[in-house]
């Protein structure tokens, strides 16, 4: 959003099955984080929390929202994850992106296909090597402020979502450490890794911006 792109978030569930907080609290937290990130839109698909399915009904809902929002790029979960919803979300987003372009697919709106589906890799211990790492140094504190909005999920925690526990470091410290590690891979302070099915093109051999030495 800081670079002038129109950015939105589609939450697939309301978090009603979570151990902490409630769907109503999560909705308030999502609204605060949207303001922090400068989102153009934030919507909720209202699918079942902790029971997310990549079935015809769910694909129809997501296709309708893709056709409404008409994104150029979709960023979703890693294809592997410890939360079943996260694994399903990755494939659901991919399948819905394809189906959305089918003119006669039974869902609201006019056909539309995003150009890319990109998968987040942060915190996955079994992730493939990233296709690329984005320099988030200038926006890292905004990222942390957006995460902090979700107090019911993350406040006082050392593990949440895809972040495994096992040490005394706060969730904030673990996020900083992970992003600093990936930043070092591109010779920057902080970075975020992503993976795509397709090959990433470069203009020339030296255009990736990362020095060998």
Where are these regions (language model features)?
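Active-site rim/loop-helix segments in enzyme catalytic domains that contact anionic ligands
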Residues: 1-69, 207-208
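Metal-dependent de-N-acetylase/amidase catalytic core
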Residues: 55-213
């Amino acid at each position: 959003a800081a670079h002038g792109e129109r950015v939105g978030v589609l939450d697939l569930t309301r978090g009603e099955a979570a151990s902490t907080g409630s769907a109503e609290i999560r909705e308030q937290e999502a609204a605060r984080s949207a303001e922090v990130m400068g989102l153009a839109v934030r919507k909720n698909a209202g699918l079942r929390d902790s029971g997310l399915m990549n079935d015809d009904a769910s694909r129809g809902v997501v296709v309708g929202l893709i056709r409404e929002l008409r994104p150029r790029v979709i960023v979703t979960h890693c294809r592997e994850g410890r939360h079943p919803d996260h694994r399903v979300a990755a494939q659901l987003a991919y399948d819905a992106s394809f189906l959305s372009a089918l003119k006669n697919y039974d869902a609201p709106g006019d056909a539309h296909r995003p150009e890319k589906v990109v998968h987040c890799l942060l915190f996955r211990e079994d992730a493939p090597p990233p296709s690329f790492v984005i320099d988030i140094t200038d926006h890292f504190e905004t990222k942390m402020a957006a995460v902090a909005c979700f107090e019911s999920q993350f406040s006082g925690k050392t593990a949440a979502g895809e972040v495994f526990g096992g040490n005394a470091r706060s969730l904030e410290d673990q996020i900083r450490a992970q992003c600093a590690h990936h930043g070092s891979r591109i010779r920057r302070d902080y970075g975020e890794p992503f993976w795509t099915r397709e090959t990433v093109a470069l203009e020339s051999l030296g255009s990736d911006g990362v020095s060998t030495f």
